[in-house]
Amino acid sequence: MAKGQSLQDPFLNALRRERVPVSIYLVNGIKLQGQIESFDQFVILLKNTVSQMVYKHAISTVVPSRPVSHHSNNAGGGASNNYHHGSNVQGSTAQQDSEETE
């Protein structure tokens, strides 16, 4: 599980540290919005008008409102410049479509 944490933790920590507004999509389709206040191995504390504890197993996607650099130990390499929300092109297209309609 340490390998999975090595991606999650720097990404979530950058979102928390920079107070980036995020949209969190749950596996049941519900969209939550706010800022990541804190997180641990199992939950994310999301703050908006109220704080909500969201279990990670219920999360499908975390979408930042703007790009963040989450590879702090990367010396300017290409990985920190590649901004992806998901593992496929279709997911990125869906996000762009939703941004255009807002």
Swiss-Prot record:
Q: Which InterPro entries does the record associate with it? A: Hfq (IPR005001), LSM_dom_sf (IPR010920), Sm (IPR047575)
Any one of the GO BP annotations: regulation of translation, ncRNA-mediated
Q: Does the keyword RNA-binding apply?
A: yes
Q: Please give the PROSITE patterns that the UniProt record associates with this protein.
A: SM
* Sequence ranges of Low complexity compositional bias: 70-88
Q: For the region Disordered, what residue ranges are annotated?
A: 63-102
Top-level division of the source organism's lineage: Bacteria
Matching Pfam families, A to Z? Hfq
Q: Which residues form a coiled coil?
A: none
Q: Does the keyword Cell division apply?
A: no
**How is the subunit organization of this protein annotated in UniProt?**
Homohexamer.
Task: Give the family this protein belongs to, as stated in its UniProt record.
Answer: Belongs to the Hfq family.
According to its UniProt entry, the function of this protein is described as: RNA chaperone that binds small regulatory RNA (sRNAs) and mRNAs to facilitate mRNA translational regulation in response to envelope stress, environmental stress and changes in metabolite concentrations. Also binds with high specificity to tRNAs.
Name of the molecule in the record: RNA-binding protein Hfq
Q: What organism does the UniProt record list as the source?
A: Salmonella gallinarum (strain 287/91 / NCTC 13346)
